Amino acid sequence: MNFDMSKLMQQAQKMQEQMKKAQQERENMEVIGESGAGLVSVTMTGKYDVKKVTIDDSLMSEDKEMLEDLIAAAVNSAVKKVEDSSSSADIGKMAKEAGIDLPNGFNFPFK
């Protein structure tokens, strides 16, 4: 087996650059989480900062507890969208693009 440390370092550097770019893109993105069929929506950045909460006027006459549940569900929906944007499948794709062959079934510990 021919082991080329220089090539491996180049591949690792390329993957690191791709990961940094993906992280910057994630930080700049915004997602919208919804609940109650869109009656409550939350706009969140890739850094998990909530930028906006929108509540349909029809909910203003509803009970407080239901409204709180809908807001929590919308926030959770937005969080899931941010987390899904940086899946281990994306990292595996970056590794492949950098020329790094990962074994089948290899999973990254962060997700």
UniProtKB/Swiss-Prot annotation:
It comes from the Bacteria. GO terms for molecular function: DNA binding. Residues 1-27 are annotated as: Disordered. Its main location: cytoplasm. Keywords: Cytoplasm, DNA-binding. Transmembrane segments: none annotated. One of its GO terms (cellular component) is bacterial nucleoid. InterPro entries: YbaB-like_sf, YbaB/EbfC. Residues 17-27 have a biased composition (Basic and acidic residues). It is found in: Cytoplasm, Nucleoid. Pfam families: YbaB_DNA_bd. Belongs to the YbaB/EbfC family. Binds to DNA and alters its conformation. May be involved in regulation of gene expression, nucleoid organization and DNA protection. PANTHER family: NUCLEOID-ASSOCIATED PROTEIN YBAB. Homodimer. This is Nucleoid-associated protein Fphi_0115.
